[in-house]
């Protein structure tokens, strides 16, 4: 009965997927995207306003570590942020001047998120899994990172820590004690 049917082999050059994190109200989270844009490269990053999209309201905040200034860039959710010409844009994350941000996060670039508004939401990261992502830590600086893969690993078992010396430190966010 199947004679004469042709079957095509399907191949893909990329592996795509998604992860979902439940976000409760009045709680701090350290969270990071674990994917790159489909068909993209790790350096592209993903826009903050494409990553954290629904279930947020005025008062919710996002802190992104700025490697250059060694301080946090602060964003707040706005129902009607502006563009540089002060045209009203769709709801999203905006900087202190109320301009909708175009900032991007790379896979493994962690941020602090606090949902101050009532009600829980879900953050869904979707994209392409990229192998071989490397996080570079310049000398005498801080970097806020997360594992760039959506899996749990032991700190000293599956992470290649290279180039570190006595006195270097790592701090791990404890979600329970905040």
Region spans (language model):
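Intrinsically disordered, low-complexity segments enriched in small/polar residues
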Residues: 16, 61, 70-75, 84, ...
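A cross-kingdom feature marking solvent-exposed beta-strand/loop segments within repeated
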Residues: 69-107
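Short, intrinsically disordered, charge-balanced linker/junction segments flanking boundaries
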Residues: 176-178
